[in-house]
């Protein structure tokens, strides 16, 4: 069975592993970066969420990290997701009134959603994201007259990789989820594997 190397945080690799298995591949996960919940931010999230008229969810990780700390029973609150994966994550958490761009999965696509026109003037929008996310959406919403609050509910930490049992010859292909992970991976690649990883790019 061919092996697909998946480079992403281990908590996000489950769907990719299932996809590989269904396609007849065996998955091998390397996680040079891991996701850590920000416990301080999560303790204050319930209050932030309760006073918001709308919540914007930046990623499935944001949803899965924050959802246990909020109450989705208020169907009147608009839930806005950056893309289809985040929208599905919200629906799995029983969120209602979810708006998702049909094309695109970035802040620009989100800003084109009609849901913004349904919110009251000076509506309070909570952006739920990881630490250090883009400020483009927040600034754009402020220009539209919305009051924006940000909850940074997780952060990324470097993770030391174990190369002891790594078999480069068994890898048939690789999926690397982001540029950040490329940089984190290559910062740790041992000299004996550097040519192999360069050949994947």
What is the predicted function of each stretch?
Residues 1-201:
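Signature of uroporphyrinogen-III synthase
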């Amino acid at each position: 069975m061919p092996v697909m190397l998946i480079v992403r945080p281990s908590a996000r690799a489950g769907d990719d592993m299932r996809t590989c298995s269904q396609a007849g591949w065996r998955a091998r996960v390397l996680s040079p970066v891991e996701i850590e919940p920000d416990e301080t931010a999560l303790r204050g999230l319930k209050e932030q969420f309760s006073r918001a008229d709308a919540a914007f969810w930046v990623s499935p990780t944001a949803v899965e990290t924050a959802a246990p700390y909020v109450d989705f029973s208020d169907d009147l609150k608009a839930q806005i997701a950056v893309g289809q994966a985040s929208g599905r994550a919200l629906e799995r958490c029983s969120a209602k009134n979810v708006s998702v761009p049909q094309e695109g999965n970035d802040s620009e696509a989100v800003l084109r959603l009609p849901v913004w026109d349904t919110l009251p003037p000076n509506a309070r929008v909570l952006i739920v994201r990881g630490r250090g996310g883009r400020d483009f959406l927040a600034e754009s919403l402020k220009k539209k007259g919305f009051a924006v609050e940000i909850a940074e509910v997780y952060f990324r930490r470097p993770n030391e990789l174990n190369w002891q049992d790594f078999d480069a010859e068994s890898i048939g292909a690789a999926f690397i989820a982001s540029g950040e992970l490329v940089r984190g991976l290559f910062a740790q690649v041992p000299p004996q594997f550097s040519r192999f990883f360069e050949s994947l790019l």
